[in-house]
Amino acid sequence: MSQGPPDSQDRDQPDIDTFRRAMGRFATGVTMLTTRTREVDYAMTVSAMTSVSLDPMLLLVCVEREGRFHDAVLDAGSWGISVLSAPHRPTADWLATRGRPLQGQLDRVPHHYGAWTGVALLNDALSTFECRTTAVHPAGDHSIVVGEVVSVTMSAHPGEALLYYRARYRTLA
């Protein structure tokens, strides 16, 4: 005879550290997320990106509400995703550095500006997406930003994808 679910008072609630480590066991791709507002480029490393829909084509990104990127992407209404390959690890490290200067942060990152949105896109990314924001959903300490894809490009010479797993960058090799 099976027992029912345990009484809620008998269960331990997960703590933030355990949750973070458990999520670290889920391998994700690594991307550069960009936006541009008031003639200033904003960029950050993001692994919390996924497709939402094919018709219409939608992507989502999760953005920390306390970070400077949050208000910029909401103000701009458009953003770009560049999918990183293994040689882009220095870019991923740089754009994940808290407190880096806003002005000139893309000076060391070879990029161009998207034709549809004007956001910075990595020159040799595995693929790029330009998006226009269609919805923003508050979600705890982050916002889920949903965007309609208005442009897609793919590298003619795809390389090894950069992954993030157990708090480290990895590749499939």
Roles of regions detected by a PLM:
Residues 1-173:
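Basic, polyanion-binding surface patches
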